[in-house]
């Protein structure tokens, strides 16, 4: 299962993502940040799922099946740590071992991007990294998209338009 996390008011981002995906997916749209959506999946999804943010544009999608075929947890990238940007394949069995905090603001979401994902990885033990080259330090540049300056992370499979990369304090 593919899960796309979004927030009301980000329909342009979601449309770009969905039109490039061309696959069935579950869209979760609320104000709970990434961990709120992952927590929803923990409670309602009983099989591994691939979590993506709405700011991803897919160039191809066959690689998604290849990663699911590994039958294990797979982090999309490891920058700034495993499951950077929270994206990757999560196993509900592992999720049931890890408490998921309620995130109140963007600063907390960024903090837990390292703290919580490290806890998940510790329980999962053997986590693959799909695209270690997707790193802020290897960004292809910056681009204004839908009124927001983004750091552009890109490889042959996808483009991620990253809104926060340490350029300013995260304020909601």
What are these regions (language model features)?
Residues 1-172:
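ER/Golgi luminal nucleotide-sugar-dependent glycosyltransferases, focusing on the catalytic module
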